[in-house]
Amino acid sequence: MDIIKIQLDVAIKIYNYIKSTGTENIIIAPCSIISSLCALSKLTDHSTADKIYDILNIECQNIDLYMKKINDNMNSSDIDYFCKLGLNNVCINQRTKNILYNCYKTCTVDETEGCSIKFKNVLEFEALWNRPFTAPTEEQIRKRHNSVEIVSILVDAKRRLHMLRRLDNIGCSVVRTSLASNRYILTTISPNEDKEEIFNLLENSINVDSLLDWIDNSKMKKAQHRLKIPKIKMSSSYDIVELLKSLGLNLMEIKFSNVFPETTLFVERIAQSSIMEIKAESISLNTDIELEFTNNEYPKINCSSCSETVVGKPFIFILQCRVTGNCIYFGVLRDSF
């Protein structure tokens, strides 16, 4: 299995759905979502598990090994990653507990109240820029929907080497820079001119093959460049139940055949919430993913949303581990006020 292809495919499926709801700023943690759904599959009946693997395009024969490779890489000095499975009035056997812990970094705890089955996946990432931004920020005035806001743009004090590529066919550029003493790579893709129609063309060009092409180091060159990125703090939250249903995975009612006693439960909520902050010294992203199942037939209503944010020129970003290539985050940011 091609790990990065699977992760980008999941990210794009989620991105396309969230964009269709009218949400403008989108932050996705594909590894966390894949891990959460695959951990859930260890408790469900075979039919549901197979549907999960199908929408993720993952071979079920190697699923535990695949997830172990991802999750072993998800804890470091820059990443804090863990998942908790809370069980109320049900239990699982020791073999399943061991698989969840060793391959999915999921510890199992007994709960006395609340949902019958609840997964909570937490990903906290913070990395220093290889070179902090020391120059004064550039203030930009942004006008949108008859409103005016000001954004502070972090700018390198002097030119330095980055990996660059011009996408002349769509009027955009790709910039790759290293984080945390070269342990991670941040790729940004943005229009050369601050025009909405160019960014719309860029967004419409997003697919797995195009992203893999854009981040291909062999097609880039080292060049002197001043990195510019907005100084922001923003939040986003997405409902995943309807997204999964649109992909053919209906989790509204699930048979849990690998818990004792065997039971059928209804979804309470499946949601991802993220906070992103970009500062002169570092970049941080924190994400919670919750999957809750109860006897209640009526789920909570969770709407996709993002905080009002001003970012200046819009851009796509991809955050990867340099060694493994894992796509830790994928996002699209634009003014939303």
UniProtKB/Swiss-Prot annotation:
Instruction: Name the keywords, alphabetized.
Output: Protease inhibitor, Serine protease inhibitor
Q: Known Gene3D superfamilies for this protein?
A: Alpha-1-antitrypsin, domain 1, Antithrombin, subunit I, domain 2
Write out the GO cellular component annotations. extracellular space
Disulfide bond residue pairs: none
Q: From which residue to which does any coiled coil extend?
A: none
Q: Which domain of life is it from?
A: Viruses
Q: Name one Pfam family in it.
A: Serpin
Q: Name one GO molecular function term.
A: serine-type endopeptidase inhibitor activity
Q: Which InterPro entries match?
A: Serpin_dom, Serpin_fam, Serpin_sf, Serpin_sf_1, Serpin_sf_2
| Family stated for the protein in its record | Belongs to the serpin family. Poxviruses subfamily.
Protein name listed in UniProt: Uncharacterized serpin-like protein FPV040
